[in-house]
Structures are given as C-alpha cells and as structure tokens.
Amino acid sequence: MKNEFTLGVEEEYMVVDPVTRELTSHDQKIVEAAQKIHKDQVKAEMHQAVVEVGTGICKNTEQARLEISQLRYTVSQLAGEQGLRIGAAGTHPFSHWEKQLITEHPRYSEIVNELQEAARSNLIFGLHVHVGFQSRELAIHIANQVRYFLPHVFALSTNSPFWENRNTGYKSFRTKIFDKFPRTGIPDIFNSIEDYDNYVKLLIKTNSIDNAKKIWWDIRVHPFFETIEFRICDCPMLIDETMAFTALFQCLCAKLYKLRLQNMKFISYSRALINENKWRAARYGIDGNLIDFGKEMEVNCRNLILELLDFIDDVVDELGCRNDINYVLKILENGTGADRQLAVYEQSGNFETVVDYITSQTLIGAKQ
C-alpha cells in the first residue's frame, strides 16, 4: 500500500497587550470571532492568553503554508480589533503564569484538578505537525525509528530562552516547563501497534487516563487521526520556520518508509540515549554538540543537521518541498528563534523590545 504523507499543522500563539507587552487573558473573544471565519480551525487553550490554530488535511507543504498564513493573518486582525497582538514563541519573556486566567471548560478543570501547579504554570506555546499514515502498524514502526532525529529538528526550533523576566540559559526552556507533566518526553520503543494499544488500555483500566490524548509525548501515533504527531518543537516565530520543520518531519517519514520498502530500516535507539541529545538541544540549540550513537562520539549539531539533509535528499523533490527544506540552511546561518531573541535582548537590554520583535516576526508572510 502506498502511503500518502498528508500534513496537518497546529500552532499556539500568545496574546499580548501592545502597551505593557504582558500576556493578556482575553476571555476567548478572539477565538469566538475567528471561528466564524475558520470554524474549528481556531480553538481555545487551557490558558486564556493562548490561541491555538490548525490547518485542515493538507496534501503538501505549499497548501499548509497557505493555511497557516491565513490563520496567522485572521487571528492577528481579530486580536487587533480587541486592542491586542499575537506572538509566536515557546514562552513569553517576562509575564508570570500566576496572573493568567484558566479557560472555563470541564476538560481544563479536570487537568488542573489532577496536575495542580504543573498545569497552572504550563503557560507555553508549541508547534505540532501531523504526518499522515494510513496503517497504524506502519506508523508505530516509523515512529520508533524517527525518534532519533527529534533532537536535531528540536534544536533548530528552539525559541524560548526567557521565562518570567530571566534568561534561563536554555535555548528552549519551554520543554523544561512541560517536563512537569506526566507522560511527556521521548517515548519508549513499541514492538507493534498491539503493544502500544495494550499500554493505553492498561492506563485507562487503572484510571491513569481516560483517553490516549492525555499521553503528551514528543511524538505519538495519534489516537484518533491516521497520523504520526510530532510535538517536540517550540512554536516558531516565522512561517518559513514552521514550514521548514514541517517539511523535515514529512521527509523523514517518507525516507524511513522508502527504506522499509527496500527491506531496510534505521536503528531504533533507546529513550535514554535520545533523551541525552534532547537535553543538549534544549540547552544549546544548534550551537552545541549532539551524540552520534553509531560512531559513539560527539558531533557538532550543525554538522549533524547537514547530514540529516543529505539523508532525506532523495525524497525532498518527490514531496515538492525543496524550498522549505532549503530554509534550514538559513536557520543555520541566521540562528534559531532563541538566538535572535537573545541578540535583541543583548542589544536593547529590555524584554519589551523582545516582545515587539516576536510579534512583528510572527506576521511576516501572514496574508488573507
């Protein structure tokens, strides 16, 4: 069976006051107005200062780019009508979570009641990319293998160096905040989809979860859609960055699928090993070293990303995403979102200017 590597892209935006630059709990007025235009493609999140958008099922990155561009434009325009702005980054540089309101909804009340401060403080913004797989059995085997590459793409996406008025020293502090949740991070290897389903059934049977959406791993075979969902990235400032990461995930899936058709596969490394690289990516972004487990040695992250681009090169043109993949080279040249935020802060000396930079970058390429 030929697999169609369809795409779905979800982004979470911060809502900010243009005067104070603080996060603003807006009682979902932006969401209600946006749903009249985009229906369920715009949703509320647990904190009122967050707006989530999502594309439909897209055939390629070109279609996904168009939809994300339109969604950013619409949400920005409607925020402006409320006297507010939107921004795309993994964390807000200085607002405190204690001041933000929780959206009134039974699901969010249940999560807050269960997870307490871990949930209330989870004021973060991510990018989720879905890649279509019509076979769940195939999806679990591809997910096992593609886990190795998650830190590489994550390093490129790092966009949350600041938290509550502090330079955290991390390029992505968002992931450190989310680590407080259960069932997060890099998942284990599952030998089959039955193996995975039995794990989910056990958690439900033992009242750990009521459905598989409460498994918040960095990658998961989605419980309701025919997709592998990649959840590791910070929300990117630029649409170009979002599409680059989307293309990387799509190409990795297509490449591993192609190898499988040739009776070959990439090694499925343990969670413990991949976690080591994830921590390095969170701390240093693309400026550190990751471990090449095959060679058992440290390698400059930028060099490993170039190796990744070589690895997927034979499927890029088949998928029609060459321009999006080429943008990875610009990120290596210009720095990640975190690098650029840090540069703005170093130059200006204040976080308000960083917020202005984030909100302006968010709208580049956004159009009706």
Regions found by a protein language model. Name each.
Residues 1-82, 111, 178-368:
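C-terminal accessory/tail domains of diverse enzymes
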Residues 18, 84, 89-94, 127, ...:
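An acidic- and aromatic-residue-enriched active-site/binding cleft used to recognize and process polar
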Residues 76-90, 154-159:
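Acidic/histidine-enriched active-site and ligand-binding environments that engage anionic O-linkages
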Residues 83-100, 164-168:
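Short, glycine/charge-rich beta-strand/loop segments that flank catalytic centers
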Residues 97-109, 169-184, 277-278:
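Short, low-order "capping/linker" segments at domain edges
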Residues 105-126:
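Acidic, His- and aromatic-enriched active-site or binding-groove loops in soluble protein domains
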Residues 120-146:
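Internal, well-ordered domain-core segments that constitute the primary functional module
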Residues 135, 143-190:
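An exposed, glycine/acidic-rich loop-and-rim segment of catalytic or binding clefts
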